[in-house]
Amino acid sequence: MSSAPKPAISYWHLWTDADGVSHQSRCTMTEFKKAAIAPQAAPQWIGAKTKVAATVFITVLPAGWIGDWHENPKPQWIIPLSGRWFVESMDGQRVEMGPGEISFGEDKNTRNVGGKQGHLSGTIGDDPAVLMIVQFEAPPPLASPCRFR
């Protein structure tokens, strides 16, 4: 492992600009250090991205499910475990994701623009989407795309 390069892990970031409009940016995490996660564990690449209280959810979106326009309730990492889902931001960008793809949602403080506020999300295809959500007890910064490196 000593010759392995540092990882580069991509994620989608749903964020709010200074005008209250949500956007999605494709970002890359590259800040990792090689360390053991426990005293007797072998070294591995670790990138601590948040250090606040968190709640973990597993949610199942039924096939054909489409939610209403809404903001993320709190900043949250969302990782599909199975199935596919989409997120559409207020700027009209639609991102489709499947198992293992990562999204960070923090579209807080958006304003209603033509009936759209926050984002729209739903499932794709004939299968439910199983999502793992790690939700944080921290307010998001405004207009900070790709803030996790």
List the model feature ranges, each with a label.
Residues M1-T16:
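Short acidic, Pro/Gly- and aromatic-enriched capping/linker segments at domain boundaries
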Residues P140-R149:
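Acidic/histidine-enriched, glycine/proline-rich intrinsically disordered or flexible terminal extensions
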Residues V60, D91-N109:
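Short acidic-glycine-tyrosine-enriched beta hairpin
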Residues A35, T110-S121:
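Short, Lys/Arg- and Gly-enriched loop/turn segments at beta-strand edges
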Residues E71, W77-P99:
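A short beta-strand-loop-beta hairpin characteristic of the jelly-roll/cupin
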Residues H70-E71, H119:
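Histidine-centered active-site/metal-ligand motif
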Residues T16-D68, A129-L131:
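A short glycine-rich, His/Asp/Glu-containing loop-to-beta-strand
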Residues F104-G105, Q117-P140:
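A short hydrophobic beta-strand segment most commonly corresponding to one strand
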